[in-house]
Regions:
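Positively charged
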Residues: 1-136
Length: 136
């Protein structure tokens, strides 16, 4: 189901709770909402649709990917960039890393570990910031 975008900064600033099996519907809602905003959005976190759970979805080189309970376990190659967000007006400067290693669970709650680089790494960092209550 396509959900409305949350723009309440006090809600967005809350740290997300871990995702569980009964949150898989939220993951599907995120995919539906991201797809509906695909012309100007490349990733979303659950708090962007008003759900305080640690779930992100993003465009992984042309295919949408879901991460439950993602955590960055390694990062390198710091750089400064400016990003925008559906939940916030305008663009803002932030620090990102060229290469990140992420641990997460897939939709079957199997633990995964993968290294991401470049644009995909930047998207993931932005969405994990949402999960951590960090507003760019």
């Amino acid at each position: 189901m396509i959900r409305d975008i949350c723009r309440d900064e006090s809600f967005l600033a809350q740290k997300a709770e871990p995702a569980a099996a009964d949150d898989l519907g939220t993951a599907q809602d995120l995919l539906d909402t991201l797809s509906a905003h695909g012309d100007g959005c490349v990733g979303m976190a659950a708090n962007m649709i008003g759900v305080n759970k640690r779930i992100i979805v993003f465009d992984n080189e042309g295919e949408y990917m879901v991460m439950l309970n993602p955590v960055i376990v390694k990062k390198s190659g710091a750089y400064e960039t400016a990003e925008g967000c559906l939940s916030l007006a305008g663009t803002r400067k932030t620090m990102r890393f060229q290469t990140i290693k992420v641990q997460w669970q897939n939709e079957r709650f199997q633990t995964r570990l993968k290294t991401f680089t470049g644009w995909t790494a930047e998207i993931i960092q932005h969405e994990i910031d949402h999960c951590d209550g960090i507003l760019i």
